[in-house]
């Protein structure tokens, strides 16, 4: 289980508000460790006995986004993961992450690029107790950079039926963030977010597993982006998620189809849909190939100011919240990717993953996108290696 880390740090410059590709929506620490949710399940089925061997892994991420004629943000990140059993009933895990972010980000809408550079260092740890029919995991995290400090704690429990075909899960996480932007727009701002998750995983057949998760988040404090012109967001934010997953094993090819859907809605007026499709195909000599597709769509926040109504270089003439940030506009996005993995000998596993992301107002589903948004593209390359010990 990954402990929650900040997802609203403006220096990360995520593409979308929620449900966008993992490499853009979350902070880089989470991206490298595949933490797509604040309280993710460790898998569709949670092991109920401590692993017999430990695991060590390295990850490297190179991410670059761009708009027409202008490269924007580049992220290069490294992570070290370690997990080891400490008895037949206990295991501990930890992750150290370091990343460098550089490039330019729009000050408003998708124009007026401003240069930026930042480095981040993060550490996460968790302790798991295994019971005959369940687990309990406690976690903590710390993420630090020049203008942002985040501290988090979390707890997650699972409980399985006697047949092991049904697993219930519940988790809670708390994050406390301190924000001190280098431009001095605000000083000593705070943000606190609590996230809860309940889930059910069910084995339907020897080849089918389904899962449903319900999530809720509630936060208060500073959610604005101090590096953007005309950005004054509400100081409270609540959101709910519904996540559905289905894994199906193909008997004829020995491959597995993985399908997922996620719905998100918050009190800012944003409603988002995410559809994930992936197919894992084992090949000869230890090779595995996984093509993937992700479709995303969101509505605009109630306080989003479209480009046509922008009063730049003056703030919008309104007494309420406002933002010209395209991340809270209405748009659609498409991600295409492929992952190739190679088992080397009995222990070493190498993997290489490539994803290409595109964002357009015209791609929004269930309604029109926000007008005058520039096309946005991003690509990420992730290299990993791991082995048990």
Question: In which residue ranges do the predicted regions lie?
Answer:
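Cleavable N-terminal export/targeting peptides
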Residues: 1-52
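Short glycine/proline- and aromatic-enriched beta-strand/turn motifs that initiate or cap beta-hairpins
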Residues: 46-86, 90, 182, 357, ...
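Flexible, solvent-exposed coil segments and beta strand-coil junctions
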Residues: 55-63, 104-106, 131-137, 175-182, ...
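Transmembrane beta-strands of outer-membrane beta-barrel pores
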Residues: 60-66, 98-102, 131-133, 142-146, ...
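Solvent-exposed loop/turn segments connecting transmembrane beta-strands
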Residues: 67-75, 117-119, 142-152, 236, ...
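Residues on the lipid-exposed face of transmembrane beta-strands in outer-membrane beta-barrel proteins
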Residues: 80-84, 125-129, 155-159, 198-202, ...
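Repeated loop/turn-to-beta-strand initiation elements of outer-membrane beta-barrel proteins
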Residues: 90-92, 133-138, 163-168, 207-212, ...
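Outer membrane beta-barrel transmembrane domains
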Residues: 111-113, 215-247, 263-274, 286-381
């Amino acid at each position: 289980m990954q402990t929650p880390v900040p997802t609203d740090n403006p220096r990360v410059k995520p593409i979308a508000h929620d449900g966008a590709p993992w490499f853009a929506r979350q902070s880089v620490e989470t991206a490298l460790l595949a933490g797509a949710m604040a309280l993710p399940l460790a898998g569709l089925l949670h092991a109920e006995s401590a692993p017999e061997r430990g695991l060590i892994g390295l990850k490297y991420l190179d991410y670059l986004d761009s708009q027409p004629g202008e490269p924007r943000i580049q992220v290069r990140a490294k992570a070290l993961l370690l997990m080891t059993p400490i008895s037949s009933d206990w295991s501990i895990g930890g992750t150290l992450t370091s990343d460098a972010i550089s490039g330019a980000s729009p000050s408003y809408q998708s124009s007026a690029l401003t240069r930026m550079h930042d480095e981040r260092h993060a550490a996460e740890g968790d302790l798991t107790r295994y019971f005959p029919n369940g687990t309990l995991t406690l976690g903590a995290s710390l993420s630090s950079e020049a203008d942002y400090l985040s501290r988090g704690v979390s707890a997650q429990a699972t409980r399985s039926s006697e047949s092991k075909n049904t697993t219930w899960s519940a988790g809670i996480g708390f994050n406390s963030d301190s924000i001190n932007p280098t431009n001095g727009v605000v000083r000593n701002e705070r943000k606190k977010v609590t996230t809860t998750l309940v889930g059910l995983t069910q084995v339907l057949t020897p080849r089918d597993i389904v899962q449903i998760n319900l999530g809720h988040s509630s936060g208060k404090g500073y959610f604005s982006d101090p590096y953007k012109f005309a950005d004054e967001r509400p100081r409270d934010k609540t959101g709910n998620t519904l996540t559905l997953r289905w894994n199906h094993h193909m008997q004829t090819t020995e491959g597995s189809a993985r399908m997922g859907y996620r719905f998100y809605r918050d009190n800012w007026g944003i409603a988002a849909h995410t559809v994930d499709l992936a197919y894992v195909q084992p090949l000869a000599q230890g090779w595995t190939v996984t093509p993937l597709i992700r479709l995303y769509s969101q509505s605009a926040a109630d306080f989003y100011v479209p480009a046509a109504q922008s009063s730049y270089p003056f703030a919008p003439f309104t007494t309420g919240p406002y933002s010209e940030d395209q991340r809270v506009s209405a748009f659609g996005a498409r991600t295409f990717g492929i992952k190739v993995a190679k088992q080397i000998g009995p222990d070493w596993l190498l993997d290489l993953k490539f994803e290409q992301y595109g964002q357009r107002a015209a791609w929004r589903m269930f309604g029109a996108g926000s007008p005058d948004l520039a096309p946005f593209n991003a690509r990420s390359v992730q290299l990993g290696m791991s082995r048990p010990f």
